[in-house]
Amino acid sequence: GSTRKNTRKEKAAVACDAGTLAEVKEKYRQERLERVQKLSPKNEHQSETIEAFKDKQLIIQSGSAGVGKTELACWWASKLWLEGKIDTIVITRPHKHLGDDYGAVKGSDAEKLLPFCMSILMKLRKHLGVGTLRNNFKMDRLDDLFGDAKGIVIVPIEKIQGLSYDSRTIIIGDEIQSASVSQVKALATRMEEGCQLLLCGDKLQSAISGINGLEYLEQVLVKHPH
């Protein structure tokens, strides 16, 4: 008899009416929105970049180190995440300039790139919060990860082709001046599925001889502005 009573009590506790559930969801949404950090542009270029974030699918930030390229990209991605508009942030970059020792480093591709993505991850931690980054950062094998899994992930630009990203995904591409033309073409085609692509690079720091991916994309956008 007591077992049945306990079972009924447990069911009653689990059964929560739709109104209460909606209130909980709304409270959680408001808490996330309150964590969105305001970012004041430091100059006209940053103001233009932030405006471009709002209605452009592909945004290229080109300039020397220290001008705030990745800071802006990470702030925007974090803002959309906390607003509930995206549920996947992909961090990608080439390993062209990392040297011949890259292949000898133990671990998965994501684990090999992790030390070189720390700057972006630190900025995401700043804008998302430690808990959100810890709970959503994925370091699983790529074959297992890129099914229906969501979260914050690292993937080498060399492996981006063939992976699918929808409109609830933002891709942050760093050091794109060291990507080849074919690699950025593969990256750009991800936009066909609806995701937003934020690319950062410095043309003066390229490890590519001849035209690099960053220069190629800039030339394309001059001819065919979107």
Positions of predicted regions on the chain:
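Conserved helicase motor core of SF1/SF2 NTP-dependent helicases
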Residues: 3, 8-20, 26, 30, ...
